[in-house]
Amino acid sequence: SPFLSKFNPLVKEQRSGADLFYFDRGDKIGDAADVFANEVRLLIDQHGNSNNRLAVDKIMLHGLRSLEALNFIVVDGEEVTEKSRSIKGADEIKAMRCASYACEKAIFEMEQVTRSEVCNANLSENDIWSVLHAENIKRGGEWIETRLLTSGPRTNPWFQECGPRIVQNNEIVAFDTDLVGSYGICVDISRTWWIGDQSPRPDMIYAMRHAHEHIMRNMELLKPGVHMSELTHNAHKLDEIYQVGKYSCLMHGVGLCDEWPLISYEDKFVEGAYDYHIEAGMVLCVEALVSPEKGDFSIKLEDQVLVTEDGFENLTKYPFDEALMGN
């Protein structure tokens, strides 16, 4: 609704959405699309010297056909928007710092509940995950895009959603926030905890240290001027036992959500797909999923990292689990 932005001096014009949904346009959706397309035409005539090239990132089919009927040449706008969002301005970086701080406070509350209640043998994965939701909303956040919190053997393979399973004493709990937080900024970080009164197994400690080394070594590669392919080819290598279950990428951009670019592992590298250089102001999430093949656990770590003029700054301050680090 236009009134939601009238208070904002940065917004010069307010317009309602095109609203090309069948459920509220019915069999006259084509007419509604024509009205929208004509509004776009008038806007382009006013500001664009009758330029008929139009970049659109997402569009309903009726809208596309109506624009083309007015002789617009519609091209893909997703590349334009992704690249324009990839370099953050000073205000965006401030907002991301605030969002990161709020997210980590929410994680802290989730960890406190987890560590205090698991011993009572009545805390489910859903119970734990609900704390992050509530604490995110409490701090001005918006929503969480996934349900990536699992415990014990459900951490391997990764990408199982949280459910009603009761977390047991002396088990791993791993999660990926994937949340849209304060100021509409995405905070996408991961941690793995050991919950229990005994020590984790040696193979778990080794995997945790290996995952920690993986993200720390890889973020050290980040600085302006580095070609994206260099990040792939110079990355820290996971042990062979973790190759099958490793994450889908080494790093990915982040801003309003997960964004361009994606830095792949060597076995997923596509020549020419990301023929660009890292620039100051980019923010990338550096990933590690250390998941032993046919194992009964996974370690998931992820930090959100800002590329600075002379290197990088890790925006993520949340500590790593002391027991799993072997301390």
Model regions and ranges:
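Active-site neighborhoods and metal-handling regions in enzymes and metal-associated proteins
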Residues: 1-327
